[in-house]
Amino acid sequence: MEMDASGASRAPISVLPAAEVKSTLKPEADKPRCSSTPCSPIKSTVSGYQILHMNSNYLVGFTTGEELLKLAQKWSSPDSSNTEALPSPIKKPVDLGLHRASRIYKAKSRYYQPYDIPAVNGRRRRRMPSSGDSCLKSIVSGEPSKALHGPLPLCLLKGKRVYSKSLDYLNLDKMSLREPVDTEVLQYQLQHLNLRGERVFTRNKT
């Protein structure tokens, strides 16, 4: 008889008979390996739920036993054609989804090429033209009206200048000369304010 440090006996006490213990442990082993992947290929049933159909994206539709009975009653009718078509709703979505996915994949690999393709003149060009390409082409061909009014939004066209203020720092010729003067004036005023404040503070101290 093994004894624990606290004095309690450590002998295993079996309340259920061996057959019952085995029966209780069985569903644990039958469950899928991971709870987040109920569509694992081990079993199609997950603790009372049966997988009704599985998508090509592994989206699974579950149904309980009661729902399955209702569906069976709905499908069952005197016509033999309906009874023959019973298993088809379960198989169809899987097959259709897989075929559809493979077809799309084939079409994509054949026709859709978004990556760069080398051009004739040696430069690499894009397969799919961006929105700015038409603007650049019209500027090069000498049609500024098309270039401005085509791809640009209305908010930029309504203003006096088409270009944003951030571009002014790049265009040094067009930059206004008032800005440095303004900053100097502001700095001067700030210094005077600080000096006045310091003087008042020293006066109050003495």
UniProtKB/Swiss-Prot annotation:
Report the record's disulfide bonds: none
In the UniProt record for this chain, what is stated about the effect of gene disruption? Morpholino knockdown increases the recruitment of macrophages in response to injury.
**GO biological process, any:** cilium assembly
Subcellular localization: Cytoplasm; Cell projection, Cilium
Q: What does this protein do?
A: May play a role in immune regulation through regulation of the macrophage function. Involved in the recruitment of macrophages in response to injury. May also play a role in trafficking of proteins via its interaction with unc119 family cargo adapters. May play a role in ciliary membrane localization.
Entry keyword annotation includes Protein transport: yes
Q: What is this protein called?
A: Macrophage immunometabolism regulator
Q: Which organism is it from?
A: Danio rerio (Zebrafish)
Indicate whether Protein transport appears among the record's keywords: yes
Q: Which Pfam families match?
A: UNC119_bdg
**Which top-rank group of organisms is this from?**
Eukaryota
The UniProt family comment states: Belongs to the UNC119-binding protein family.
Q: Name one GO cellular component term.
A: ciliary transition zone
Please describe the quaternary structure of this protein. Answer: Interacts with unc119 family proteins; interaction preferentially takes place when unc119 proteins are unliganded with myristoylated proteins.
Q: Which UniProt keywords apply?
A: Cell projection, Cilium, Cilium biogenesis/degradation, Cytoplasm, Inflammatory response, Protein transport, Transport
